[in-house]
Structures are given as C-alpha cells and as structure tokens.
Amino acid sequence: MYWSLTACSAVLFCLRDSLIFLADDVNPERGNEGVAVGTGGIPGRGIPPLITANGIGLYTFTSIGLLVPFTLGLKTQNQQIKIVVKSKISETNKLVIFCCLKHIISRKARSWLNDSR
C-alpha cells in the first residue's frame, strides 16, 4: 500500500491532541521544560516540532520505537523522545500513528540524504 506524505501528515495532524512527546531527561523541578505536547517542540532545547502540517520533523526511529532527534551534518544530540498516547484510542489507531510517523521519517530521511549527495 502506498502511503502519501501528505495523507500521513494529515492523519497525524488530526490526531495531534492525543499525543504527547516526552524528553528522556524531564526534570519535574523545572516544570514542563523538556516536554513537548501535540505539535510543539521542546521548550528551551532547540528541538523543532515533530509533527507539522507538512510532516517536517528532524527525527528518526530506533529499533525500539523511540524517536531520536538528529541533524544532518552535525553530531546527534544524546536525547531521546518517546511518544505517549494521552487519550484512550484503539490499537488500530496506534498502529496508524506509528505507520504514519515511520513513513514520514523514512521519506524525509531519504530526501535529506539525496540532497546531501
């Protein structure tokens, strides 16, 4: 099945209120610093939004489903982002979210690699 970048982005954009993105070093003493909700980035850390209307996000998947921010040409930051589903949604919707994210990331990564050659 062909997943278009626009369709995947639209699905995730519609479901954005059900998702929260947590940094691995969230410190409760600093309030919500290190937490990104919905389409937002991580305040004070220079990490851009993961999901935007056009699907742009500087993140890639690891084998265990975490998201690791990366910037081409620079050293990878040692920070991991994980997706937490805030509201109760079906397993099917969770799978759709995962597939959409994976597709967007792989397409963007391929595009960046081609541009850098």
Swiss-Prot record:
It is found in: Plastid, Chloroplast. It comes from Chlamydomonas reinhardtii. The keyword Chloroplast applies. Keywords: Chloroplast, Plastid. Similar ORFs of opposite polarity to the rRNA genes have also been found in higher plants in the ribosomal upstream region. One of its GO terms (cellular component) is chloroplast. The lineage of its organism: Eukaryota, Viridiplantae, Chlorophyta, core chlorophytes, Chlorophyceae. This is Uncharacterized 12.7 kDa protein in 16S rRNA region.
